[in-house]
Amino acid sequence: VNGYPSRDVICQDIARGDAWLVTGDNGDAVGYFVFRPGPDPTYRHIYHGAWLNDAPYHVIHRIAGRPHVHGIFDAVMRHCQAAQTDLRIDTHRDNHIMRHLIAKYAFIYCGIIHTEMGDERLAYQLAATP
């Protein structure tokens, strides 16, 4: 969206081994996301709430997909839930589609975090075990 993530950011994700592709039935890349173990520096401070626990976690960032391709978030979640760890994710307040998808998978709203650029994001956590 608006040039983010940039090519440089994607190259850094790949170099760290954190980048994942979602492929369609024909093998074409239809989506992209980052999945990596925490701690994530932007999740160190949370405001107007608290994380569910201090358990080890993985973060999901930069979910992007081709327009009009459905099921990308479902594929991301199949991959991430296989890690059997707590998951943390954040999104912009105005990203209603992502907020709906996050709620669909029973993530719990935990509070507000700020990105490295200082932008506010809604932060969520899904505990691996209740």
Predicted segment positions?
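Short, P/G- and charge-enriched loop/turn segments at secondary-structure junctions
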Residues: R7-V9, H45-L52, C110-G111
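Conserved acetyl-CoA-binding loop-helix of GNAT-fold acetyltransferases
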Residues: G65-A82, R99-K104
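Conserved GNAT-fold acetyl-CoA-binding loop/helix
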Residues: V1-C11
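Conserved GNAT acetyl-CoA-binding A-motif
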Residues: V59, A82-D94
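Conserved catalytic-core motifs of GNAT/GCN5-like acyltransferases
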Residues: D90, A106-L122
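Active-site beta-strand termini and strand-to-loop segments that position acidic
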Residues: T23-D25, Q125-T129
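Conserved beta-hairpin
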Residues: R16-F35
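Conserved acyl-donor/pantetheine-binding loop and adjacent beta-alpha core of acyl/acetyltransferases
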Residues: V34-H68
